[in-house]
Amino acid sequence: MTAAATRKLVRAYYERFNAQDVEGFLDLLTPDVVHEISQGGSEKGRAKFRAFLLRMNRCYRERVSDLAIMTDADGGRAAAEFRLDGRYLETDGDFLPASGQRYRLRVGAFFVIREGRIARISNHYNLKDWLRQVQR
């Protein structure tokens, strides 16, 4: 896959994220996708990723902007940096109670691409900053 094709794939990933298009989002992933959650472990497979997306869409309303995508020369790896603006709508597990709190974070993500699809996603953001913002 070329670097340009990888940039297009990663951009499509975030477009579908913004649209909350779960099935379209999953179409971009390999069946055995590995999702490394910021400060929270790792999950494998589309079914687990689907469950993650459905929970996120229920508990949060988020939008990616100011997206910068970088790739290696052959398009096998990519990185993205972006701003994430969100609202915390429904209490998520053991986190603080949700009441529509707004937040804004800088996020970094890393991707491995295999056969034209995303095979690994690793997201990184400052959880302490998020907690500070939603405690207000």
Annotate each PLM feature.
Residues 1-136:
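C-terminal and inter-domain tail/linker signature
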